Regions:
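Short acidic (Asp/Glu) and glycine-rich catalytic loops that position anionic groups and cofactors
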Residues: 44-51, 77-86, 131-136, 174-175
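Conserved PLP-binding catalytic core of the aspartate aminotransferase-like
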Residues: 88-102, 109-157
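Short amphipathic beta-strand starts and helix->beta connectors
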Residues: 22, 121-126, 161-168
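Flexible, glycine/charged-enriched surface loops at secondary-structure junctions
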Residues: 27-28, 59-63, 79-85, 112-118, ...
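C-terminal catalytic subdomain
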Residues: 60-107
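Short Gly/Ser/Thr- and Asp/Glu-enriched loop/turn motifs at secondary-structure junctions
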Residues: 32-35, 134, 171-177
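Conserved PLP-enzyme active-site core in the AAT-like
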Residues: 1-75, 196
Length: 217
């Protein structure tokens, strides 16, 4: 429950319970940032009945899931929730993201990659906030306006990034590939991403050269 955060967009669990809901179901992963699990909260009487249901044995989580969920909840309880990657990504301030995008662009330039920092909207996605967007910044390739062949080249670059090592999930907008820095855990991933962009561009350049006509009959 992130009061004052730009990520807040719907009633929180505590608000739903306070409003009189007998049971509220929510995910242990997604916005909470813990392991994949389902959590039921609400009136003690109802939760007690659910604990006695025959299906509980089949649906109860294993010890590893419980341990990791407990660790995540303890971070929130103790005020260390900034250590939860999902929380950090969703609550990052635009100024921090702009600085991160600038650093990535500089690393790209040093690696010979022509990129440009652009403002964008990051989609939260998932079942929790499928339509919610947050202001963000991204590095766009190629820099400047896309040419008439931009869409085809962007698709090749996006595919090369997905199949690279490490794999990078980018998106295409207006004929250019965008790498949204809100999706990064922290700045330590920037050098790795810049290198992945360089490798993907070189891979696409090789494909373009191989496909180009030689001029020989």
């Amino acid at each position: 429950e992130w009061e004052g955060s730009s990520a807040a967009a719907e009633p929180t669990v505590s608000e739903a319970v306070a409003a009189g809901c007998d049971v509220v179901a929510f995910s242990g992963d997604k916005l909470l940032g813990g392991p994949q699990a389902g959590i039921l909260a609400g009136r003690g009487e109802v939760i007690g009945r659910l604990r006695k249901h025959p299906l509980l044995r089949a649906l109860r989580p294993d010890k590893l899931t419980l341990a990791t969920l407990l660790s995540t909840l303890e971070l929130y309880r103790d005020g260390h929730d900034a250590q939860v990657p999902t929380r950090r990504m969703l609550t990052a301030e635009p100024a921090v993201l702009r600085a991160r995008a600038d650093k990535l662009q500089q690393l790209c330039a040093a690696a010979g990659v022509d990129a440009e920092v652009v403002g964008t909207q990051a989609a939260v996605g998932g079942g929790a906030m499928p339509l919610r967007t947050l202001p963000s910044f991204a590095v766009a390739l190629p820099a400047g306006e896309a040419t008439g062949r931009g869409d085809a080249l962007a698709r090749k670059l996006e595919a090369a990034l997905r199949h690279g090592e490490p794999a990078v999930v980018a998106r295409i907008e207006a004929g250019r590939v965008l790498c949204d820095v809100r999706a990064l855990v922290d700045d330590s991933e920037l050098p790795l991403l810049a290198q992945a962009l360089r490798q993907a561009l070189h891979s696409c350049a090789g494909v373009e050269a191989a496909a180009a006509p030689s001029g020989l009959e």
